[in-house]
């Protein structure tokens, strides 16, 4: 059985087969998840049985490369371990079914799952048994079943090419890193670029030399109304203030309170509504506005897509498919949004009928992420959602509705003030028509200036010079890293969350104040990959490869050709790395105390979950200890031990007693060593929204709290 979907000549290699069926029963529908199966079965009725494959049923073997390089990069698939009972059950159900429909997700991975199911169940590729829908609603599902299609082998080839390329890179470079650096390391097409971006930014920060500069801000009065203006220049030319001497020269030219209004420039400015969400823009906004990690965003979005029970409405899918780089909105959804906006705010707020241009490279079989039913407002369904589901749904709903509204219009005014050739500029703006801002909060606020005319006089109230220093570029957050990867054409919607997870799991980077900081190990690995595999971390090279893979999806290129084009030069780089890469010894840091088992010095080692203490006499002595941080508070449970800061395997901080397991005290919040004056329970320090901390009672039923601390 050939494992590629097509030969080089693009002729389908799978022969048509005839299946003998027993007495026809129900129509069998196979989806990925049980939650999705439950929703769809209710929509389709008694003549359909919907079952779940629970993700992929076949994959490449984990213990080997599983790609036959000598035979056109043929992937060597096996049934996933532990899925034999499920596969047997699917075969039995398919044999008894009247017809079999494959309704996995509407993307490359979903198409590949359907292709593997067709192979396992011996379904002809010519058969129209593939059903796709972008939202799990009754109408969308029923309409999709009216138009089943063949499995899209181009889409499968694109997925298979990516899978093979990832194997070739990961399973070729990783063993070299194991030999030269340490076990458990990995490299990958997207993760190595993400790591390089983080390391490069850290190098920029370390090399940054702050430069001094100054500003002069003034407060002025027109009658009783005050407004602000900032120094711009001298004698009609912009004049930067680099030193205190520059400031003194300006201040010496100021004489008295009167400033002349030289110029008043009024304009009308339009600000268009934001586009509806793609996967990456949703991830960025969820990180910035909701403080969600990327993985959490995708997990909650999956729940909203697969559906929740909404009282009398029953089980409903709440959003469209959440892995997309399209900003397209269907005409039906546009019409529904128009009706909602016109009803709630008036016709003048709706931009019904306007077309949206997609970003270059967007896979436009999908829509943008939007609510399945715009009339399911966040307030209307809030009681059926948990707090995280409601937060993300509200974000998606607001963004979609705003995207279908007209631009906001601002009146802006720019006023030039001068005295003795010293020029200050005041800028003001006022919302003339709120447009999409009616529903979508924006950071810009109106800054009203008093009405002024040219050649009149205003009074200076005070002028304040202030020293500043230029700041280094900020470290990447999850949101800014995803944005940079997307802007460079690296990766696709489905790759961002697992990429960020992998570079943290390998301890190449750590999150410090929600920003990525490279570890020593990450810097070592990055240096080696940059030196020996420059194309892997070249964003232009990787973006070009993504375009080639998109052409495979469009049927314009053969996947084997694209893989071969990459692998031949890559194989030479592998040979050079095997010969030229020197072995690197990561030195253990002395811990400063001796082993309590054998007396040898303890050292600090780097493991999968971070640093830990270990005996230097390993393997003769295997004594290890967790690195703990005392917070200076006695245990509120046993009153004998000390509270220490610890981390879960997922790197979440919690607090526990150092007498564990004799004392099992734990708390997610930091105890402060005082008891609540109302309930007597111990007090804890909680982080509060908007930054800062607050001391509250650890007893949820007690409302005691102290003032917020910044």
From Swiss-Prot:
Residues 1-22 are annotated as: Disordered. It is an enzyme of class 5 (isomerase). GO terms for molecular function: DNA binding; DNA topoisomerase type I (single strand cut, ATP-independent) activity; zinc ion binding. Residues 152-574 form the Topo IA-type catalytic domain. PROSITE patterns: TOPO_IA_1, TOPO_IA_2, TOPRIM. Residues 26-136 form the Toprim domain. Residues 7-22 have a biased composition (Basic residues). Belongs to the type IA topoisomerase family. This is DNA topoisomerase 1. It comes from Lactococcus lactis subsp. lactis (strain IL1403) (Streptococcus lactis). The lineage of its organism: Bacteria, Bacillati, Bacillota, Bacilli, Lactobacillales.
């Amino acid at each position: 059985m050939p494992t590629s979907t097509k030969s080089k000549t693009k002729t389908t290699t799978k022969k048509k087969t005839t299946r003998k069926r027993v007495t026809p029963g129900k129509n069998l529908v196979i989806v990925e998840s049980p939650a999705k199966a439950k929703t769809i079965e209710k929509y389709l009725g008694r003549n359909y049985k919907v079952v779940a494959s629970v993700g992929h049923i076949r994959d490449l073997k984990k213990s080997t490369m599983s790609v036959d390089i000598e035979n056109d990069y043929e992937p060597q698939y096996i049934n996933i371990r532990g899925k034999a009972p499920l596969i047997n059950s699917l075969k039995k159900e398919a044999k008894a079914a009247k017809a079999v429909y494959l309704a996995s997700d509407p993307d490359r991975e979903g198409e590949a799952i359907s292709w593997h199911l067709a192979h396992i169940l011996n379904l002809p590729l010519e058969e129209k048994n593939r059903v796709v829908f972008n939202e799990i609603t009754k109408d969308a599902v029923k309409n999709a079943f009216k138009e089943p299609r063949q499995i899209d082998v181009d889409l499968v080839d694109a997925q298979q090419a990516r899978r093979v390329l990832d194997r070739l890179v990961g399973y070729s470079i990783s063993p070299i890193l194991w030999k030269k650096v340490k076990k458990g390391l990995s490299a990958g097409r997207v993760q190595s670029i993400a790591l390089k971006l983080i390391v490069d930014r850290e190098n920029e920060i370390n090399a940054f030399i702050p430069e001094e500069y100054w500003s002069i801000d003034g407060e002025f009065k027109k009658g009783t109304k005050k407004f602000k203006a900032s120094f711009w220049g001298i004698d009609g030319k912009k004049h930067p203030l680099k030193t205190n001497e520059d400031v003194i020269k300006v201040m010496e030219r100021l004489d008295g309170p009167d400033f002349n209004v030289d110029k008043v420039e009024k304009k009308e400015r339009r600000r268009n509504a934001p586009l509806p969400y793609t996967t990456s823009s949703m991830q960025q906004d969820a990180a910035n506005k909701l403080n969600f990690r990327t993985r959490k965003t995708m997990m909650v979005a999956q729940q909203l897509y697969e559906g929740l029970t909404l009282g009398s409405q029953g089980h409903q899918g709440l959003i469209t498919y959440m892995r997309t780089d399209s900003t397209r909105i269907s005409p039906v959804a546009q019409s529904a949004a128009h009706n909602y906006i016109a009803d709630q705010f008036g016709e003048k707020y709706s931009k019904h009928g306007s077309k949206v241009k997609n970003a270059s490279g967007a896979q436009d079989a999908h829509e943008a992420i939007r609510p399945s039913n715009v009339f399911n407002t966040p307030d209307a369904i809030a009681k059926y959602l948990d707090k995280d589901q409601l937060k993300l749904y509200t974000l998606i709903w607001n963004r979609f509705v705003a995207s279908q509204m007209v631009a906001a219009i601002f009146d802006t005014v720019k006023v030039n003030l001068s005295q003795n050739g010293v020029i200050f500029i005041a800028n003001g703006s006022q919302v003339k028509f709120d447009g999409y801002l009616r529903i979508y909060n924006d950071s810009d606020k109106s800054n009203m200036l008093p009405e002024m005319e040219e050649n009149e006089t205003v009074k200076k109230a005070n002028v304040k010079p202030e020293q500043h220093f230029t700041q280094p570029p900020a470290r990447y957050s999850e949101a800014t890293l995803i944005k940079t990867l997307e802007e460079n054409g690296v990766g696709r919607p489905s790759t961002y969350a697992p990429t960020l997870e992998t570079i943290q799991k390998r301890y190449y980077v750590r999150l410090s104040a929600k920003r990525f900081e490279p570890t020593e190990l990450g810097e070592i690995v990055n240096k080696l990959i940059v030196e020996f595999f420059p194309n892997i971390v070249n964003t232009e090279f990787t973006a070009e490869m993504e375009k080639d893979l998109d052409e495979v999806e469009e049927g314009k290129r053969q996947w084997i050709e694209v893989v071969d084009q990459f692998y031949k030069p890559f194989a030479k780089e592998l040979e050079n790395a095997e010969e030229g890469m020197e072995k690197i010894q990561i030195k253990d840091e002395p811990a400063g105390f001796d082993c309590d088992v054998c007396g040898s010095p303890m050292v600090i080692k780097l493991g999968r979950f971070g640093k830990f203490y270990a005996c230097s006499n390993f393997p003769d002595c295997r004594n290890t200890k967790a690195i703990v941080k005392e917070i200076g508070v006695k245990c509120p449970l046993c009153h004998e031990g000390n509270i220490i800061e610890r981390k879960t395997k997922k790197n979440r901080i919690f607090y526990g007693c150092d007498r564990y397991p004799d004392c099992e005290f734990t708390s997610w919040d930091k105890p402060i060593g005082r008891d609540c004056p109302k309930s007597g329970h111990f007090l804890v320090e909680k982080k509060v929204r908007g930054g800062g901390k607050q001391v509250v009672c650890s007893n949820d039923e007690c409302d005691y709290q102290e003032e917020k601390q910044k």
